[in-house]
Amino acid sequence: IELIQRLTRKGKIFSGKRVAIFGATNERDIAMPVIQGLPDTECINLIGKASISSVTACIKRCSFFIGNDSGLMHIAAALGVPTIGLFGPSPAQRYGPWGEHCQSVVSSESYHTLIGKKDFDHRSSANLMNGLSVDAVEKATCELFDRIKGSASG
């Protein structure tokens, strides 16, 4: 929620832009805070509402994609959409999005550090993303945006 609010604030890179939220039906609960944190006029909620081919067509129309290591992240990258891939401790150099229009943000904590924490729950992969900071993702997003914008005008 904080990342989207930062990036869509007045004067920021996605100010006045709409945000599309993609995911499967079983991801609705985890996505609701993000959806509820955006004004209805700025949110396109596609959680569980579209087939993979429809989602692919929607992603193709996006001007930017930020998401975890997933099939949708790879679809965005393959379509040429500027893509920020979010990674826990898995190796982004192996599984990250490819291309000049892509960048990965990786957890600052190793896999062994993350699984050794008291609150680690092996039934949830959410714990593996806790080492990602909003600041790091915002910085990477702004850098990629500036790089893409610069290459388009130059």
Where do the protein language model's features map onto the residues?
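Donor-binding and catalytic core of enzymes assembling or modifying cell-surface/extracellular glycoconjugates
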Residues: I1-G88
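A structural signal for well-ordered alpha-helical scaffolds and beta->alpha junctions
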Residues: E27-R28, G88, W98, N130, ...
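Flexible, glycine-rich phosphate/dinucleotide-binding loops
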Residues: R28-D29, I52, A92-Q93, S104, ...
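Short, functionally important structural connectors and interaction interfaces within domains
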Residues: E42, F87-S90, P97, F120-S124
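Glycine-rich loops and low-complexity Gly/Arg-rich segments
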Residues: I44-I47, S70-G71, S90-Q93, S108-H112, ...
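Short, charged, surface-exposed secondary-structure boundary motifs
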Residues: S54-T56, R94-Y95, T113-K117
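Gly/Pro- and small hydrophobic-enriched strand-loop and loop-to-helix capping segments
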Residues: L79-S107
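Leloir-type glycosyltransferase catalytic cores
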Residues: E100-G154
